[in-house]
Each structure stands twice: as C-alpha cells, then as structure tokens.
Amino acid sequence: MKNYLSKIYVIHYTKLIERKKHMISEFDKWNVDIPWEIFEPYDQEDISQLDIIEHFDMMAFRGRHSREMKTGEISLCTKYKKILQKIIAEDEGDYFLILEDDVIFKEDPLKYINNLIAKCEAENINFDCIFMGEAALRVGDNRDVFAKKPYPSTNGLCTVLYTRSAIERLFASLENYRITQPMDWEFNDRFRDLEFEVYWGKAI
C-alpha cells in the first residue's frame, strides 16, 4: 500500500501527562511508522501578552461572545497556528494529519487515510481537508461515509487531514487576520471564506 501521509502532529497540553502516554500507546498499537510529533510549546501558562496581541483580536472576541477568551482556548489556537507554520517551514510532503491528544482510533488510521487519498486521486476528488473525528455530532457514528460538507463544515478539530496547499492558505489567512473566535468556529468561517473543499470521512 502506497503511503501518502507525510506526518502526524498531536496538539498536547504538557500538564496532561497521561494523554501523552495515551497517544504514544495509540501509535504503538497501530504500528504508525511515519514521522509523528507531539507538539508541546505554547501551553496556557506560557502564553505572553505579545503572543495574544500577535494572534488575537480580543475586542472582537468579546463583541462576538460577550466574554473573555479562556486561556485554554488561547493556547489551543496558538498551538494549532504554530503547527501550520512548522509544517510550511520544515516538513516535506503533501498530506498532514493534525490530532488532539485524546484521540482513540477505532481502526488502523494509516490504512484508512492512505486508501481514502488513493480513492480521491483515482476519482479526481479535490479536497482541502477531511474530518475523521468522532466528536460532538458524530458520537457513536460508525458509518463508512465520505461526503462533501457545506458550511458549517467542522465537527471539532480532533482528527483532521489537510493538504499542504490548504495549510499554506489557512496559515496565510491566520497571519493576515487575527483570531476572533474559539478555534472550531474560527476555522468554520476561514474554510468558508477560503472556499475550502471540506469533506467528512468515516469517524476512525
């Protein structure tokens, strides 16, 4: 089986030590033999005021949500953006999987993803990102689905496959316009504005 996936990143909060152990166990269980990285910088305790000014429009956030942005939300957004930046600057390849650190795979993730990308290539299906997480609306969903998802297109950000082109465009957008929402809804609007081809795959 051809391997299409270039690297896996895991967003991790370092104080949750058991979650890091869990993710390493998941990779061992499924014999994940491609590069992966547990991304730890920018914990909520380490975010500086300069980080906030650079990445966030807090006045707009308060106007949208009538509250202050939580430190955990700030950290998650910053980690995600820094991963996108790192991929662009340091990694080769065309496809990247970004995970949150509490993912439990129900099947071999590499096999499923490689087969799905092969299907897309064979059938000339162009996608920017594919959601494969069992979160929120998809708890207990075991259907083998693959369909284009209109706005609002996100369902949590726990298991998302991106193309390099999508990562480059998304990062450029985040550089040009500061974050004004929690990450899930921020990405919903960015994907719409960037005219992303968003699909939902099987919740693996």
Language-model region placement:
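An acidic/histidine-cluster motif and surrounding catalytic segment
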Residues: M1-L99, V103-I204
